[in-house]
Amino acid sequence: MSLAQLEHALQHDLQRLAHGGEPWVRPRVHPAGHVYDVVIVGAGQSGLGAAFALQRERVHNVLVIDENPPGQEGPWVTYARMQTLRTPKQITSIDLGVPTLTFRAWWEAQHGAAGWDALDKIPRGTWMDYLRWYRAALRLPVRNATQLVRIEPDAAPGIHRLHLAMGAPLMARKIILATGIQGGGQWQVPEWITQALPAQRYAHTSGPIDYAALAGKRVGILGGGASAFDNACFALDQGVARAEVFVRRAALPRVNPIRHMEQAGIIPRFAALPDADKYRMMASFFGRNQPPTNDTFQRACAHAGFALHLDAPWLGVEEHNDVVVVRTPQGEHRFDFLAIATGLVTDPRLRPELAALSGRIACWADRYQAPPGQANPVLDAHPYLGPGFELLPRTPDDAAAVDGLFAFNYSALINHGLSAAALSGLKVALPRLARAVADQLFLDDRQAMVEAYLGYDQAEFVGQWPQPTQAVA
């Protein structure tokens, strides 16, 4: 089967499923222009999947926006530097149960069943190619080069304005923030590094780093997670002379809790847990860290320029004689550049697009008090979400301003587990999100919906009794 044949089969499958259909949502009229029922911010895998899931709910007045050029959405061809995805190849996600929309179907259309059997893990760039195909095959409404700056409530009830970096604001009844891992906060470089070094001497691994320009140079990498080793391998492949990873712990993590969550039924049912159980499990999740994949670690070790320093927290950094000096308990180390793989901080107050609303958004600290000795400020700063990923108000007075906003990004982790920004969870998370958005749209107009039902009188049955006398031939 070719890709063209696969796309034909996909359209046939969608017809069999009665995909789409006539819209039922009542349109809003606004003097300033068109009002979208839903605007999805972010055209990566979560945003595209959300648009498809809404189509399944017959919600069609939807726009997906992304600040990046077409085909550059998400991390896969920007700052992600692993060779392959860490997620097992057989896990389904944004296909929503349509076999001809799966990555496997797309791969086999090009490489056959034997090619699937030969595939170990999904190459990073190949996954991005699949997302490009997915968007085109489903004809999803995406507007690129569109950067959201600020969200604020409109004077008209139930409508939000999305102010953009360029162009007129958009108006929407519902907004889905499908903004990935960093979408609920920001990547963080420790302040003691930013204050000690000029900006050209360091970068967070989530941002652009021209490792090719550092060929022949020495790079120090702070962090013990998978991304630290991804960057070490990538840097060495680009010609860096030395890539040394520094880990605070005395040993690398060996257990990947995600694998257990995938196998034990936790991912689809995490949201049903009581808050106390969610809090305990996520505190453990943050404490464990995700180990590098075995193949990535072995690739790093195979490079002569690689070194790993365990039990080696950075005590300080400084620039001296055109060299960056890093102090650890093991001594001083000299580098030309530092790559910081220390993760991110999740807190809606850090998001510029939510600046007008952040003080009105409920966080875990507002809704749950951990037992003595278990409180975790990292968890407490996460937004406290409803069952459909909706942001909730801190106080009743904040309800109108926050209503209609959905955090379908990594900040949903504490309430929903691996869901919105994890391939392992999208299979379950996307239908839950789409139903919640559709329910809100329906309930917003419930009075009109009920009255329309009560007044419905279109005749369907046209039979007569007694039957009219038939003319004799």
Curated annotation (Swiss-Prot):
Query: What EC class does the entry list?
Result: oxidoreductase
Q: Does the keyword Nucleotide-binding apply?
A: no
Task: Please state the pathway this protein functions in, per its UniProt record.
Answer: Purine metabolism; urate degradation
What biological process terms from GO does the record include? Answer: purine nucleobase metabolic process; urate catabolic process
Q: Which keywords does this Swiss-Prot/TrEMBL entry list? A: FAD, Flavoprotein, Monooxygenase, NAD, NADP, Oxidoreductase, Purine metabolism
Report the co-factor binding details: FAD cannot be replaced by FMN or riboflavin.
Question: Does the UniProt entry include the keyword Lipoprotein?
Answer: no
List, alphabetically, the InterPro entries matched.
Auxin_biosynth/cation_transpt, FAD/NAD-bd_sf, HpyO/CreE_NAD-binding
Record GO terms (molecular function): FAD binding; FAD-dependent urate hydroxylase activity; flavin adenine dinucleotide binding; monooxygenase activity; NADH binding; NADPH binding; oxidoreductase activity, acting on paired donors, with incorporation or reduction of molecular oxygen, NAD(P)H as one donor, and incorporation of one atom of oxygen
What is a single Pfam family found in this protein's UniProt entry?
NAD_binding_9
Cofactor(s) named in the record: FAD
Reactions the enzyme catalyzes:
urate + NADH + O2 + H(+) = 5-hydroxyisourate + NAD(+) + H2O; urate + NADPH + O2 + H(+) = 5-hydroxyisourate + NADP(+) + H2O
Q: Which Gene3D superfamilies does the protein's record reference?
A: FAD/NAD(P)-binding domain
Q: Which domain of life does this protein belong to?
A: Bacteria
**E.C. number:** 1.14.13.-, 1.14.13.113
Hey, which family's this protein in? Belongs to the HpyO family.
Subunit text: Homodimer.
**According to its UniProt entry, what is the function of this protein?**
Catalyzes the hydroxylation of urate to 5-hydroxyisourate (HIU). Is likely to be involved in the urate degradation pathway to allantoin. Is slightly more efficient (about 2.6 times) with NADPH than NADH as the electron donor.
Q: Could you tell me what this protein is called? A: FAD-dependent urate hydroxylase
